[in-house]
Curated annotation (Swiss-Prot):
It comes from Dictyostelium discoideum. GO terms for biological process: mitochondrial translation. InterPro entries: Ribosomal_mS35_mit, Ribosomal_mS35_mt. It holds the Pfam family MRP-S28. Residues 513-529, 882-905 have a biased composition (Acidic residues). Residues 906-915 have a biased composition (Basic and acidic residues). Residues 32-51, 510-529, 882-915 are annotated as: Disordered. This is Uncharacterized protein DDB_G0279527. One of its GO terms (cellular component) is mitochondrial small ribosomal subunit.
Amino acid sequence: MYRIGSSIKKSNQIRLATIRTTTNVVIRNYCSETSSTQPPPPEQGQETPKPIIKKKKQSREIFSEFVDDGDVVVDHRKHSQKKAVVDQRTQDFDKMLASLTMKDLKLMRYSDNPETFELFSREHFNINDAFEMNLTTKSLLQKQKEKEQKELPGSLFKTQKVIYDNYSQIKSDHIANELNKFKEEFEKPLVSAYNEVINQSNLLYRTKRAEERLIKKRIEKERKEYKLSGLEKHYRDIVQVRNALDFRGKTILAGSDEEDAWQRILERSEITDPHNLSRLHMMDEYNDLGYQTEITEDYINQLSIVPFDFANPASYSSMVNLIDQLVQVDTYRDPEEIASLLVAEKLRAIKKANDQGTEEGKKLSKLLQSQLILELKADRYLETYECTLPELPTPEEIKKFTIDELKELEIVRMAATRLEQYQEAKNRIHILEDNTKQDKIDNYKFYQQMNAPSVANSRDATNLLTVGEMSLKAGTRPSTEDEIIDLLPHDEEVREEHEDDLVDDEKVVATTNEEEPSQEVEESEPVPDIEDPFAINKDFFDKNGRFLLSDKIEAEEQEQEDLIKDDDVAIENVESLITEESVPIAVEESVTTVVEESVTKPPKFLERFAEKGKLPPIRNSNKDSVRQIAESLFNINFDYQEELDEIDGRMDAIDAFHENQEELPLDEREGELDEDIVRPLPSTLPDLKALSAKIRKNEEESLNMIANKYINQEVNEKTATEVLDQIYEAYKTNNLFDKDIIEHDKNTIREANGDVAIPESMYFEYDTTFSDLVDRDVIFKMPLKDTDLVRVLTHQLTETGLLKQEKVLKHNTDDMPVSKELVESNPDAFPDFVKEIIDQNPNDSTDMPITREYIETYDPLIKEFREKMSITKNKDGSVVEEVIEEELIKDENEEEEDEDEEDEGDNKQRVIERSDEVHDEIYDERRLYINLRPQIKDEGVISVPTSTKKITKPIEKDGIDNNDGWLMGKPFNMLNYRLNNQPNKLPMDNVQSEGERVPGEDEPDILVEELADEEDEEFKDLSPSFDQQPKIFEQTDLYYYLQQGKNQEWFRPEKISDKDITSLERRQTWYPRQHIKTYPFEFISSHNTTDQTIEDSWVNRKAVLKVNISAFNLSKTVQDRLAQLTANRYDPQKKVLTLVANNHKTLPENKYEVKRLFKELLHEASLADPNFVSVRTDNYKAPQPQSFVPSQAAKNQTRFNLYRLQGFPLLNNQQRQHMELYSHIRSHLDSTL
């Protein structure tokens, strides 16, 4: 039927097309005939007659070519005569219908869609494929593709069509093969060689380098925070540099101070680990070692700080002077340093005398030059002859000496004075040795015991065993009585015993000194005074102290000076002399000095004494030279291993003396005890004086380099920042991170605390004594507040010894008083909210509040009261305060009652008592302002004020799209929510109807009166009476409102107590909670914070959705299709589908994404159901109008006329109809003309 209807439709189209063509032919034929009636064209040689045109009919003749007859428009334009050729092609419709193929019939479906029509028109169909169900669009496209890839006919070459995707894959495979070849040839040998090279030592080295780079990166990262962005940061950096310099000056030279060593460790840890990432348990972001607190403390002194102007040299010198003042001056200097300073001073004096240009200055410079030469020659003489002198010649022998010999004699005399100084210092050292050797013995064994084997400080097992063997051989001795006394508190009796022991030790030392043979030089004659330079031999000097042979010496010197003409030679000779002496002298440039001849030969007059045997042999040995003697004098470093035998012998003598000596009573003991008993440093510590000198030298060099760099630059933010950064970096490299200082700190702490492991950085843990903080953190995972953090850290710092007890925060920072100026300048921030209740009597609510006007009225009474409060003294000397209450309580209206008088007197008395506090209306230093107190009392649990979030857009999504399945966040009716929109059949428990009374309770009227008396007027409307029906929200909100405001000042706790709350609790009715049907969903998500520096991790944004498919009542085909789509995500046994989404940044987005994915899967699976109708917009298509319209007879079903039986019209009949139509049109047109 369908094919027959299509063929009829096609035949009708053909018939209409033929009618349309015949009509056109008729019109063309008629136009050709009308044109033939016109006059013929003129022949050649004749003129064409001109048409006569009337001007009046010009406008009308323009359109005269067209004649409108109402129905037909006829064209009168002239056309060239053409013979119309009628196409008389014959079309046999029977033959056309018979020639229709199945392809034509099938293509009629796609006549409305040209793209599909074109696609299907390319293929050839068989009659057998008309009703083939397996034919799909995919198979047709595959056939079309194969057809396109066929070889062209007559082609000599094979056509290769390459798709881009295939070509890209080929290229990727080629690159992968090349990479594999490279790995086989080069990478594997390199990896094997790398694994052979890397061993344990290399790993340690790499680890150390990595740690250094990590420290540099962290320091660089922290340094960027100090870039200047304003004056405030500039001052902060200045404070930091000032504190760093001050800290360096006070602690580096402070000796074995344990607190300073701990402070340096803490500062190093703060620089290397500013965020305290090396802690164990304290994982909150507030633990920053109190850095912000230190910065705020430094701001107290920032107004007194003036930034240094590094472009000004005077400012740089002031900084150097500041460092010199901070450093403790060490007067106990090395003799070489003293000698070099003396020589430098004399050289400066010589230069100054030469610069004067006068004769006196020249004489003075010559005298100083001669003295300097004599002193240098005397030092050289002592070094050459091992600090021994021959016998001085007699005056008779001196008269025979030449001038050279006299000069040499003067050198020997000066050497004698220096030798006496050295001998005196040696005697002092010997006494010092006897007094301190016993203490050194005990300290040596104590340090030996302190450095016992320990796993903490041992590098490997062999080192541990060797140290253990040494400690076992050394042994340990029991604690003596003196050591036990040192550990006990020093009472007066203990101090006396200790004094007596000190006296006994001095006696033992004296006895041991007498027993030992003295190794000193025997003094046959009394030693002359060192201060008298001419006391050695007075025969050579006159009464005025002038040398007798000075004239000869001056003449000889004049001859030598004449030979010297160039000053440069003299300077070079002096420089060579100084280098020979190897004395570090700070010689300034352009300093003129004298010519010095190095002493390489012995004096001439000593040759005579050598013959007589009076001169000791010359030995150029360096054992007892002046330099080594000075080191033995000033740097006392005993070698305990070499002197162990001598020490043991002295210990035996001391023990024997203690055994033989009788113990004296306490009253007879004498002696003095130093209150500050300082323990000597351990032997492993470096020399503190040398270490301090090294640090100071490095600091001065770094400061000098920085000052020279910025000496002439403009002072702005950039230069100031660079200078501050460089100073701070130099401070860290020279002071904090110096290897010797780190080792010094560790040994200092070990000296004080024993053999302990010293941490590289400090970290803190929670203290279990703070039970409220531990409960709050462990149970509720809440971070510490700032006040709690200060409390915990100060407590821990005092326990570790890093803070003193008086520095601990004793008062809460929230309760700190505020300055009066701050309150007066900000009246809005500090409102006077307690003005009405601060002085009210809690028992009497009718008291008048104290205001400014009230105080001004009683101001004369206050002045009079102060006058009456004059302090007088009795005869006994006691102070008496005279207060006359009757004069103070003076009423203006004497006719008032006695009760009113008493009340007014009380008000006056309270005004007088608070006169010093309320004299200012705004400021009260004892008042706690509202922004300095917490809004809710913190008792260790979560207590957050209620806050309702406004919903900008109403949630109109379905339950599957709604992220808020439990309605947490939008308003709802509590009663309908709990009863699930069911009527409330349960009666109210404690609500009585009129006339009903519950036995055992008070009368309702009495109860209402009690409530009315206790409650305040402000809350009266919130408490319902018994005759009212309570609302569901009224009870809960009032209870929460009062519970949050309990014990708070602004909630008037004296007016509303717990009794009111309990009465409200009795009225509350709790309805049973019923089950609410929800979708069978289960979301699995994580809320753990993995790192404090990252806002959220990938685990937190991951959303897992588990769906119970059995709850959806799906058909078997849909379930199978869903299982086929989801593969292993679907569990066929439990019928649970698991979907995961983690592509989005937040958890709500991933939840929405996984729910959308489930909806898509459910829709796709439902398409397998043939009865499923999709209403989605992407799948819905509007129905197309039917192309076949049945006839009226077909609608009425009266008769059925098939087109094939009726037959098609013959060609003759059709031509006849056309001629009839043609004649009709022509006759109609002729009638109109």
